[in-house]
């Protein structure tokens, strides 16, 4: 059975048992600031388990993409050195939200393992929480396992908690006995032993308690089930492989690494480690980039960068000196094409990101490894065993070495790392931060509403006004029964025409009214459960919970926002067609006044390309194409070629916005009815916002007209100042610049002549002899180092063999030049002489052995500095 077949067998089995098959969520958690990445199958159901959200199904099954690298759950350093640790893996799971419980969960798992995966029953054993008599009884009496095959383990092994407080419960694990050759040899070896004989393949969590702040466990009203089985592990069992890396999920990638490196897997343990690291990290990198994570120096992007750079370093150990990750990722695309077709669709973009990062790091990798090697050699000579924190930080800051790489290099050398010193050096750098909307701290009123399955019905696609009932009034996090004039207020209603900020589109503004009541709505937001929250101030009257009110959206601002949103879709299509299909949306902001569109690309767009993009968008606007909106299943949308943002969270039914013959995207925002409603599109700027990410800012409609008028006004004003027509302005400016450059050269020549004249015509007797060498040393008139250098060259040419030391003062600064003829550079080094002289004027300097310069803030000591230079020459 292949990996793809094992995944399909699991999902098909539970679908046939009445479970809803739910698509894997993005690796980027949605509205959960407590997690860096999705690291378990239950993450996308977290709010359901906590009773804060209701879904239209009570049982579900998934194959969830997971990453454990960075943060609390970090397997990065173990990858490559163990049989089963991975940064990226798939978690197969089945879930019950208050539906079935222990007995059914155990029966389903056992049936699938025996009859679906055909595992030998006599090789399976289980563990239960030592106090969970119910689970023990089910395994013994219902399943028929002998007591000797049921291990009772403690809280560390068999009790799961979501946190210090909240849902928790005992768990039961199923193990595969791999045989005595993997064991420790002890007669009491059993599940829970630290050896490799008993391999955990499935964990079932029985979520039946709520842990209070006091530590007390109280029963949950609706116990739930959360199970997880690693696809890679079950494949190793089914395919009878010693490690996960020898399954068909990894072997094709390893074969590609063998071909590129000329090494063979299985012949040398250290080379095997390298291949396993590269294979694992290639999978993680491909999926992270596919889900919108890009290499950076903070947060998720830095974890990705660590993964990539660790793979590159291990590639060097295999002799791979040229970029190789794009090739290994290509194999990942092929292996994963069936379950994750979007990965292959994004292939060109993912490989571009990989190649760009690999080239960047390769430029500094060798220098960093050299510094680390020199440090280790120096430590060995001194008998030291801890790498200084300053060195670790320099490797990180200058050479881009994550600490993981340093640890890997010294892994077998019994060398420690001064992490306190590293942390202290890191703390000196300005911490980068980014605000996150933390819906985990939403007011109790909102949690109660969402727990009841309440969602605000949005009717704003069809109209801009509606009547609704007030469900909640909140001020400062506290729920109110009423609010009066002057109070800041948040209002949740059962229905609303107001669009809540999401998907990059800003929320609507407008008014809420009733008899004697008026509320000015200044913003509208949408929380993850579907509640729409209107923020504003009571202008007059009193609003009460349960009251019927009228809501009206500001029509002009909505229309302008809709035009800008449709324009982003046209811009996206233009970028894909003109710049390349590697372009993917990396973010957006849509407001009534302007739009901002972030996209993946690795170089600046020139003026000609931006002009082509503008022409494309404006042509589509003038064609007045229809904008149609339809709802369909996710699978149907993908079949029709709709573009999805894979870092976004989508439900089973999606909304597709299509611009006739131009684009088709999954989008929940508001849009123009026809492209002609946009009016005019004008790009304001294009710039870099991160490595591999560019940003275009633009305006449409009245905003675009205002911008063009402003630019025309500036052009007319500039033309008037130069008494030229706007059409001839560029040529006139070019002429003025050419004249300016010519005059600058003339001025520089005059200054050099003035400096030369100040020497009163150097003659042979101007040079004095010091230490058997002809030396010209004096102050001259020059206002910049360039003039001083030019004069020094002339004087050295006249001397033939000798040393020239010149000094000048200008603008409160001292300048020094030392020039040594080439035949004397073995005796005198210009850089050494000028460095000593520079100290006299309070400055620094340096250069080549034959020419060096310096500057300092104390021109009053210039004569003394020149004398210092002469003294050095005299001592020679």
Curated annotation (Swiss-Prot):
Protein task: Catalyzes the attachment of alanine to tRNA(Ala) in a two-step reaction: alanine is first activated by ATP to form Ala-AMP and then transferred to the acceptor end of tRNA(Ala). Also edits incorrectly charged Ser-tRNA(Ala) and Gly-tRNA(Ala) via its editing domain.
SUPFAM superfamilies in the record: Class II aaRS and biotin synthetases, Putative anticodon-binding domain of alanyl-tRNA synthetase (AlaRS), ThrRS/AlaRS common domain, Translation proteins
EC supergroup of this enzyme: ligase
Gene name in the database record: alaS
Binding site for Zn(2+): 565, 569, 667, 671
CDD domains from the UniProt entry: AlaRS_core
Organism: Desulfosudis oleivorans (strain DSM 6200 / JCM 39069 / Hxd3)
NCBIfam families: alaS (TIGR00344)
Catalytic activity of the protein: tRNA(Ala) + L-alanine + ATP = L-alanyl-tRNA(Ala) + AMP + diphosphate
Pfam families: DHHA1, tRNA-synt_2c, tRNA_SAD
The protein's name in its UniProt record: Alanine--tRNA ligase
GO CC, alphabetical: cytosol
UniProtKB keywords: Aminoacyl-tRNA synthetase, ATP-binding, Cytoplasm, Ligase, Metal-binding, Nucleotide-binding, Protein biosynthesis, RNA-binding, tRNA-binding, Zinc
Domain of life: Bacteria
Necessary cofactors: Zn(2+)
Localisation per UniProt entry: Cytoplasm
Alphabetized InterPro entries for the sequence: aa-tRNA-synth_II/BPL/LPL, Ala-tRNA-lgiase_IIc, Ala-tRNA-ligase_IIc_anticod-bd, Ala-tRNA-synth_IIc_core, Ala-tRNA-synth_IIc_N, Ala-tRNA_ligase, Ala_tRNA_ligase_euk/bac, DHHA1_dom
Cofactor note: Binds 1 zinc ion per subunit.
Domain commentary: Consists of three domains; the N-terminal catalytic domain, the editing domain and the C-terminal C-Ala domain. The editing domain removes incorrectly charged amino acids, while the C-Ala domain, along with tRNA(Ala), serves as a bridge to cooperatively bring together the editing and aminoacylation centers thus stimulating deacylation of misacylated tRNAs.
Principal subcellular localisation of the protein: cytoplasm
């Amino acid at each position: 059975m292949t990996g793809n077949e094992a995944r399909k067998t699991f999902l098909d089995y539970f679908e046939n048992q009445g479970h809803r098959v739910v698509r894997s969520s993005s690796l980027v958690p949605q509205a959960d600031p407590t997690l860096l990445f999705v690291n378990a199958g239950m993450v996308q159901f977290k709010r359901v388990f906590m009773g804060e959200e209701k879904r239209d199904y009570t049982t579900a099954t998934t194959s969830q993409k997971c990453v454990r690298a960075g943060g609390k759950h970090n397997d990065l350093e173990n990858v490559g050195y163990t049989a089963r640790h991975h940064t990226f893996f798939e978690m197969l799971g089945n879930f019950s939200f208050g539906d079935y419980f222990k007995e059914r969960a155990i029966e389903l798992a056992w049936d699938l393992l025996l009859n679906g995966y055909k595992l030998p029953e006599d090789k399976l054993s289980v563990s239960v929480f030592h106090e969970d008599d119910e689970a023990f009884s089910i395994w013994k009496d219902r399943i028929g396992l002998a007591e000797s095959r049921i291990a009772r383990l403690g809280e560390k092994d068999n009790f799961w908690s979501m946190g210090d407080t909240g849902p928790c419960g005992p768990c039961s694990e199923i193990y595969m006995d791999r045989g005595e050759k993997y064991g420790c040899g002890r007669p009491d070896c059993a599940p829970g032993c630290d050896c490799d004989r008993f391999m955990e393949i499935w964990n079932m969590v029985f979520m039946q308690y709520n842990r209070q702040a006091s530590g007390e466990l109280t029963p949950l009203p609706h116990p739930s089930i959360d199970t997880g089985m690693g696809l890679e592990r079950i494949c190793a069992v089914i395919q009878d492989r010693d490690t996960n890396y020898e399954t068909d999920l990894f072997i094709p990638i390893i074969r590609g690494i063998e071909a590129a490196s000329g090494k063979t897997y299985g012949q040398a343990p250290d080379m095997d480690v390298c291949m396993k690291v590269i294979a694992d990290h290639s999978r993680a990198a491909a999926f992270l980039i596919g889900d919108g994570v890009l290499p950076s120096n903070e947060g998720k992007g830095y974890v990705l960068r660590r993964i990539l750079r660790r793979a590159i370093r291990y590639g060097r150990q295999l002799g791979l000196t040229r970029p190789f990750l794009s090739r290994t990722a290509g194999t990942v695309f092929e292996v994963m094409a069936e379950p994750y077709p979007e990965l292959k669709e994004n292939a060109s973009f993912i490989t571009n990101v990989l190649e760009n990062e690999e080239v960047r790091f390769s430029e500094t990798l060798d220098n960093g490894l050299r510094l680390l090697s020199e440090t280790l050699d120096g430590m060995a000579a001194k008998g030291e065993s801890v790498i200084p924190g300053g060195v670790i930080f320099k490797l990180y800051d200058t050479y881009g070495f994550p600490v993981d790489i340093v640890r890997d290099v010294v892994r077998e050398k019994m060398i420690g790392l001064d992490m306190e010193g590293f942390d202290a050096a890191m703390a000196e750098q300005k911490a980068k931060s980014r605000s996150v909307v933390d819906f985990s701290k939403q007011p109790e009123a909102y949690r109660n509403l969402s727990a009841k399955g309440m969602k605000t019905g949005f009717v704003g696609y069809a109209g801009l006004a509606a009547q609704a009932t007030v469900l909640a009034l909140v001020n400062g996090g506290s729920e109110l029964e009423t609010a009066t004039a002057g109070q800041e207020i948040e209002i949740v209603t059962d229905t609303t025409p107001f669009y809540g900020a999401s998907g990059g589109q800003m929320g609507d503004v407008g008014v809420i009214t009733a008899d004697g009541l008026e509320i000015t709505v200044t913003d509208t937001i949408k929380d993850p459960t579907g509640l729409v929250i209107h923020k504003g101030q009571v202008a007059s009257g009193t609003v009460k919970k349960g009251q019927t009110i009228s809501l009206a959206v500001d029509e002009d601002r909505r229309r302008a926002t809709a035009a800008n949103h449709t324009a982003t879709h046209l811009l996206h299509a233009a970028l894909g067609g003109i710049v390349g299909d590697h372009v993917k949306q990396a973010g957006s902001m849509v407001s009534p006044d302007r739009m901002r569109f972030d996209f993946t690309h690795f170089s600046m767009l020139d003026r000609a390309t931006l002009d082509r993009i503008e022409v494309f968008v404006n042509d589509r606007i003038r064609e007045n194409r229809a904008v149609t909106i339809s709802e369909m299943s996710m699978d149907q949308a993908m079949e029709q070629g709709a573009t999805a943002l894979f870092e976004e969270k989508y439900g089973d039914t999606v909304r597709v916005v299509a611009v006739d013959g131009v684009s088709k995207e999954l989008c929940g925002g508001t849009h123009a009815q026809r492209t002609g409603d946009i009016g005019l599109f004008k790009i304001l700027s294009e710039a870099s916002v991160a490595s591999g990410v560019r940003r275009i800012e633009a305006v449409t409609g009245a905003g675009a007209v205002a911008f063009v008028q402003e630019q025309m006004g500036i052009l007319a004003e500039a033309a008037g100042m130069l008494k030229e027509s706007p059409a001839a302005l560029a040529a006139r400016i070019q002429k003025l610049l050419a004249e300016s450059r010519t005059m600058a050269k003339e001025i520089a020549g005059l200054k050099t002549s003035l400096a030369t004249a100040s020497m009163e015509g150097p003659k042979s007797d101007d040079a004095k002899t010091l230490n058997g060498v002809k030396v010209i040393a004096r102050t001259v008139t020059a206002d910049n180092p360039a003039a001083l250098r030019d004069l020094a060259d002339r004087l050295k040419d006249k001397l033939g063999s000798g040393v020239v030391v010149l000094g000048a003062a200008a603008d409160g600064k001292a300048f020094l030049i030392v020039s040594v003829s080439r035949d004397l550079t073995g005796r005198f080094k210009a850089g050494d002489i000028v460095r000593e002289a520079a100290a006299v004027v309070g400055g620094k300097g340096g250069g080549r052995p034959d020419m060096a310069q310096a500057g300092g803030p104390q021109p009053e000591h210039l004569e003394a500095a020149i004398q210092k230079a002469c003294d050095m020459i005299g001592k020679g």
